[in-house]
Amino acid sequence: GGCTNTERLVYTFDPPPRPVGRRSGGTRPPLNPVDPTPTGGLVGRNGSGPGGSSIFGYRRRTGVVRAPLAQPNETLRALNLEEPRNGERSEVFCTKVGTTNPDEMYIIGAHMDGHGFGEAANDNGSGTAIVMELARIFSAPDVQTGRSIRFVLWNNEETGLNGSAAYVEQRRERQGLEDPPGSGRYPEPRWLGMIQHDMMLFDHGAPGPDGRVSRDQRPEADVNIEFQTDSALALESRDLAFFFKSANDAYATDYPAAVGPHMTNTDSTPFMNVTPAISLRENERGMHIGAGWDPHWHQPTDLYVTFTDDDFRLGLNAAQTTLAAIAQLVDATVSAP
């Protein structure tokens, strides 16, 4: 059967109130150094990013647009006006049940919330589309998998990974339990790995000294696969990341993949001390996105019309990468018509 066994995880979104920060007086320090590097370069090492990353080169200021009038489109302005409210939330998932090992699964995820008064096209309509397309492909009636695959669309990522953290909290202790006993049913198969997709389209290179980023996808664009060295399962996650790179080497049509050790700020993070966990992105989150390489990140310009076919093709190659890797890991077969 297909991925029709849709379920929901219900949780309570109840963070403490955000502190109202006082703006510090004076001017902010310059984003980029004014003096040359010790070796005479114009710009070099330029601070640290999240996840243990180091930033090199020119940076571009980043942040979340919260001003409604920054979005000229009235429909999008209205769509973005709702602020996160504490209360009950849910997120949807479905499962391709394995034929030989239904009690084991890989989790494939993306977050479906967004902010910044845009359309959330890249962050994270792009990752959401990949998960839905992979669910469609694997759910074809002529596709069998030995192991199970769960496709999850997280909520509340932008507010602090709340939806994925709730999933881990509620379900980690239920892994591999047959319920009811003797039924052959496993509501929460044992986690073999978690793969997150978050911002898949835009790899136009570093900003220049004027803060501008190229309008075009760069010739060196690639799919960035990240694991986190500072996690309990770093070695297993590293192996999973390189397995995905080898799948890209074998099957991607347009763009290669690169592996980095600083996975951060996305829904694979709550999983990383429980199961091997990786993220796929347009750039490394710490040293690239964190340095302002994507000028549409959390901005009103994160719109479908912003991105080109070359941008969308990078997302497609990430989908090819995950499809090829997971198909091998779950022993997928296609029966003859």
For each predicted feature, which ranges?
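Sec-exported extracytoplasmic/periplasmic mature domains
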Residues: 1-4, 133-143, 168-177, 245-256, ...
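Soluble metallo-hydrolase cores and metallopeptidase-like ectodomains found primarily
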Residues: 3-120, 140
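Second-shell loop/turn segments in exported
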Residues: 77-83, 113-125, 153-154, 181-182, ...
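Soluble non-cytosolic domains of exported or imported proteins
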Residues: 102, 121-132, 143, 158-162, ...
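Metal-dependent peptidase/peptidase-like ectodomains
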Residues: 154-267, 273-277
